[in-house]
Structures are given as structure tokens and as C-alpha cells.
């Protein structure tokens, strides 16, 4: 039985563009196949949701503070009016433990991201030459992808 998806064209497009917008059939399966193919080609992969991402550069790459949810009346004198700020490690920190591998960050539900957030993802890719990002931008009848910069031009500039 021949392979339905070898990942060669996807790998070549990912290497040249570094940031891709992907449209996959809603029944799934293509994402994990492509991730497996990229791992076989030497990529270290990390998959996460784009929901609640906030500032992508800070949330993915830098140490940042997160306030816990407000749970009713609390003492103002202990933590100030805004509450205690807990320091959280970057979400994609496990990608950056190894410097020798190519890194692939796969973001699910990317259709919730704004134009500026997508542009900052492209900027992150250009700053780190070993990092590549794939953003799932919704469903399609067949698997297709295009550079994220082209997606931004098509979607937001019209």
C-alpha cells in the first residue's frame, strides 16, 4: 500500500517559508501524520492550542506572569489590589532545551488569532532560524497549506 502523504512537499515548503498556514479536513489524522514525518526528518515538535495565547512572543518564549482567577473576597493587604502574580515558564520551553535540532511549533485553532498575532509569529520565525511554525487556520475538504504571510495578505487585506 503506497503512502498517502510522504510529507516531502510539506517539508520543502516549511523549510523555505518557515511559517505555514494549514487547512486540514475536520475528521483529522493529517496533523499527526505530518508531525510524525517531520520528527522522522529530525524536527523536535511541540503541539499546542492557540486559544488564550495572548502575546505570542512572550507567552511562547519568555518568562511571564499570570494572575490566578479571582475567587471572591480576598485580603487586599496581603497581595495588593490586583492579586498575586505567579511566574510561569514559557509554554514552548521544552522546544528550546536542545540547540542542535530544528524545531517545529504546531498551533491548533489558529483562526482565533488576530492579524498582529499572526505577524508576530512570522517575526518569531525570522528571528530564530531553527524554529518553524505551523498554524492550523481551519478546515478544508483536502489538506492544503500556504505561507502564513500569503494567508495574512489574502485574509486581512481584502
From Swiss-Prot:
Any one Gene Ontology cellular component term annotated for this protein: plasma membrane-derived thylakoid membrane
Membrane-spanning intervals of the chain: none
Catalytic activity: a plastoquinone + NADH + (n+1) H(+)(in) = a plastoquinol + NAD(+) + n H(+)(out); a plastoquinone + NADPH + (n+1) H(+)(in) = a plastoquinol + NADP(+) + n H(+)(out)
MF annotations from Gene Ontology: oxidoreductase activity, acting on NAD(P)H, quinone or similar compound as acceptor; quinone binding
Localization, UniProt: Cellular thylakoid membrane
EC number of the protein: 7.1.1.-
Top-level EC class as recorded in UniProt: translocase
Keywords on record: Membrane, NAD, NADP, Plastoquinone, Quinone, Thylakoid, Translocase, Transport
Primary role: NDH-1 shuttles electrons from an unknown electron donor, via FMN and iron-sulfur (Fe-S) centers, to quinones in the respiratory and/or the photosynthetic chain. The immediate electron acceptor for the enzyme in this species is believed to be plastoquinone. Couples the redox reaction to proton translocation, and thus conserves the redox energy in a proton gradient. Cyanobacterial NDH-1 also plays a role in inorganic carbon-concentration.
Sequence similarity: Belongs to the complex I NdhN subunit family.
HAMAP family: NDH1_NDH1N
Subunit architecture: NDH-1 can be composed of about 15 different subunits; different subcomplexes with different compositions have been identified which probably have different functions.
Name of the protein in question: NAD(P)H-quinone oxidoreductase subunit N
Species the sequence originates in: Prochlorococcus marinus (strain MIT 9215)
